[in-house]
Amino acid sequence: MTDNSRLRIAMQKSGRLSDDSRELLARCGIKINLHTQRLIAMAENMPIDILRVRDDDIPGLVMDGVVDLGIIGENVLEEELLNRRAQGEDPRYFTLRRLDFGGCRLSLATPVDEAWDGPLSLNGKRIATSYPHLLKRYLDQKGISFKSCLLNGSVEVAPRAGLADAICDLVSTGATLEANGLREVEVIYRSKACLIQRDGEMEESKQQLIDKLLTRIQGVIQARESKYIMMHAPTERLDEVIALLPGAERPTILPLAGDQQRVAMHMVSSETLFWETMEKLKALGASSILVLPIEKMME
């Protein structure tokens, strides 16, 4: 029997977002065994249950109040939202925050040997897709009529199979399109993973746990986007060195034993430190430059 006092989080069982979701939960300190085939896994150190389901089931589970939170791609979430609105429903949920993984784009693609003069080239054409509502919204806004061919997989083979004139599908590198004689011609939606919460009253203990989880997620994302930098820098050029690190907090400056001309600098930078920046630092007289990853961070 389900314990309603435990926080329920839905995540993709397998696929594009599964590994990243699992890593995020682990880095937030949630100890859970997700290596078994069980669809419900219980955290060892927190009152949290993880439901491992198909990604297109997650928005509905949250909107219907079956689970408290869901980790889902914005593309899947928006498609389900449009689908429910088309059926006269008023789906409710909260987006707690966008996450730093799961980036993709939903694009139109046509055979490479066909001319492309913009979206109007699709007027009256048949388009295969797994995202009929996102596609319809985009083309309706441009006043383009089309016929939709709904496919739940292998969308890219539709033109060769004679099922459609073009496709609308998720694209990462474009290699799959190229292998099927297609080219990406228009991006209609850009997506990342996000964390969503069900609407309605939440028990105080659950809300406190959600707030704690959000703080940890923020710390994980900040740590990924930040680097800890250490170096020796000439005293007379400190301002120039600091100016090369936009987004950095004010550095900690320590004296070097037996050296009055240089100091040791420690700082956290919120931007990626590229080789070009390191070379400029060296040109200013900095030495022993170390750039280290940060595992956890809390402001």
Curated annotation (Swiss-Prot):
Any single Gene Ontology cellular-component annotation: cytoplasm
Necessary cofactors: Mg(2+)
EC number: 2.4.2.17
Pathway per the UniProt entry: Amino-acid biosynthesis; L-histidine biosynthesis; L-histidine from 5-phospho-alpha-D-ribose 1-diphosphate: step 1/9
EC top class named in words: transferase
Disulfide bonds: none
Family per record: Belongs to the ATP phosphoribosyltransferase family. Long subfamily.
Gene: hisG
Primary subcellular site in the record, as a coarse category: cytoplasm
Key words, A-Z: Amino-acid biosynthesis, ATP-binding, Cytoplasm, Glycosyltransferase, Histidine biosynthesis, Magnesium, Metal-binding, Nucleotide-binding, Transferase
Activity regulation (record text): Feedback inhibited by histidine.
The protein's name: ATP phosphoribosyltransferase
Source species of the chain: Escherichia coli O7:K1 (strain IAI39 / ExPEC)
GO molecular function: ATP binding; ATP phosphoribosyltransferase activity; magnesium ion binding
One example of a Gene Ontology biological process annotation: L-histidine biosynthetic process
Catalytic activity: 1-(5-phospho-beta-D-ribosyl)-ATP + diphosphate = 5-phospho-alpha-D-ribose 1-diphosphate + ATP
Localization, UniProt: Cytoplasm
Subunit structure, interactors included: Equilibrium between an active dimeric form, an inactive hexameric form and higher aggregates. Interconversion between the various forms is largely reversible and is influenced by the natural substrates and inhibitors of the enzyme.
